């Protein structure tokens, strides 16, 4: 096994925490390791694998350097740049899903740091918040909405219409925060930066492979799509494959197994059976709170076994993506790409107040809806 991979695992405190939690939970449920692979959402793992390969391919091609240089010519202040990146992340997430949007915007943000002095960690935090806010608008913005849309019987427009008030409220809140958190001071460019060298052939190949991979996802042939993408990089640029942060996949696998073990706890089985009898406020708080612990996608899957795919449930699990790091898998993706331990704590300074505000105002808006 690659020594760099082992060193990365040894440094990964979050992965180690997940392993410890899993070991502790195993003491209170039947020990059945053979069932653990079935607890993993392999569609998510395969999709992430393909996206990480494609994004790393574009990054190593040098195209983000070219795009970043063009962007810095258009924006003159931190506030302008932050507003653009936040709006771009939110807009992309409405139709490309929140994780895909992050795989585009975050590497670009990291590249911009080479060209000018920017608060890169703060920008990445706001981009993570932006994709959570933007993706909740449409049925295809995130995995939980895809599940809810399939169960609701609503059209694309009807589902988007029921989510629009919450999406507008969250985006206005986020843009207002941008106004206060990013000053209007001029961007300070680094001197002596050379003109970027990039590889057009690799960029166009990544674009072609991206189309192939998306088509495979649409046809529910994600494994074959991943095989084609990996084969393409073996031929074009093998360094892409070894440069990907594969430990992220182990983190996701550990999360899925921990969630599975948690739901098997005998003490929780009776609690879940009472979910259908909860009041509107009780279900609201349960969906948000559960999302903080096991993430909003598993929470949606779990709660749909007991309650219908209502507007209340859709709003609650999407709001649950804010707050603590596990609330949304998009949070984990964004912060991992930042590759800076300090960002893990700073994220919560913004995300927890957003959760409290969204839970309070969101429930108030829900009461005003017919």
Predicted regions and their residues:
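N-terminal membrane topogenic signal
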Residues: 1-19, 77-78, 197-205
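Long, contiguous bundles of hydrophobic transmembrane helices that form the permeation core
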Residues: 2-4, 172-231
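Interfacial loop-to-helix junctions that mark the boundaries of transmembrane helices
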Residues: 6-14, 34-44, 154-166, 195-199, ...
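Transmembrane helical segments that form the transport core of multi-pass membrane transport proteins
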Residues: 39, 56, 61, 68-70, ...
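Membrane-interfacial loop-to-helix junctions in multi-pass transporters
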Residues: 42-44, 73-84, 115-123, 200-204, ...
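Short helix-coil transition sites and intra-membrane helix breaks within transmembrane domains
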Residues: 56-62, 92-104, 134-142, 262-264, ...
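Hydrophobic transmembrane alpha-helices that form the pore/transport pathway of multi-pass ion
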Residues: 85-87, 91-136, 301-315, 343-344
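C-terminal transmembrane helix pair
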Residues: 160-171, 175, 285-370
């Amino acid at each position: 096994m690659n020594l760099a991979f082992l060193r990365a695992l040894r440094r990964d405190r979050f992965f180690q925490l997940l392993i410890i939690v899993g070991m502790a939970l195993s003491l209170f449920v039947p020990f059945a390791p053979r069932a653990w692979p079935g607890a993993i959402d392999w569609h998510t793992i395969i999709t992430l694998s393909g996206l990480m390969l494609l994004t790393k391919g574009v990054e190593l091609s040098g195209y983000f350097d070219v795009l970043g240089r063009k962007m810095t010519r258009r924006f003159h202040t931190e506030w302008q740049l932050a507003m653009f990146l936040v709006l771009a992340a939110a807009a992309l997430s409405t139709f490309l899903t929140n994780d895909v949007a992050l795989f585009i915007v975050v590497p670009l943000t990291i590249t911009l740091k080479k060209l000018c002095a920017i608060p890169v960690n703060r920008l990445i935090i706001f981009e993570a918040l932006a994709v959570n806010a933007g993706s909740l608008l449409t049925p295809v913005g995130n995995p939980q909405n895809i599940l809810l849309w399939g169960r609701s019987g609503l059209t694309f427009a009807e589902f988007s219409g029921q989510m629009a008030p919450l999406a507008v409220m969250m985006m206005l809140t986020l843009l207002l925060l941008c106004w206060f958190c990013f000053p209007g001071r001029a961007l300070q460019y680094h001197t002596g930066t050379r003109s970027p060298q990039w590889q057009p052939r690799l960029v166009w190949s990544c674009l072609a492979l991206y189309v192939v991979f998306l088509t495979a996802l649409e046809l529910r042939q994600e494994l074959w799509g991943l095989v084609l993408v990996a084969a393409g990089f073996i031929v074009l640029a093998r360094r892409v494959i070894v440069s990907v942060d594969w430990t992220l996949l182990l983190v996701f696998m550990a999360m899925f197994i921990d969630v599975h073990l948690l739901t098997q706890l005998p003490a929780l089985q009776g609690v879940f059976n009472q979910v259908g009898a909860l009041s509107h406020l009780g279900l609201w708080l349960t969906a948000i709170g559960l999302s903080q612990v096991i993430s909003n996608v598993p929470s949606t899957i779990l709660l749909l076994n007991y309650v219908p795919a209502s507007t209340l449930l859709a709003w609650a699990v999407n709001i649950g993506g804010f707050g603590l790091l596990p609330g949304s898998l998009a949070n984990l993706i964004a912060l991992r790409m930042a590759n800076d331990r300090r960002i893990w704590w700073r994220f919560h300074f913004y995300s927890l107040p957003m959760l409290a505000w969204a839970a309070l105002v969101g429930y108030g808006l829900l009461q005003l809806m017919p």
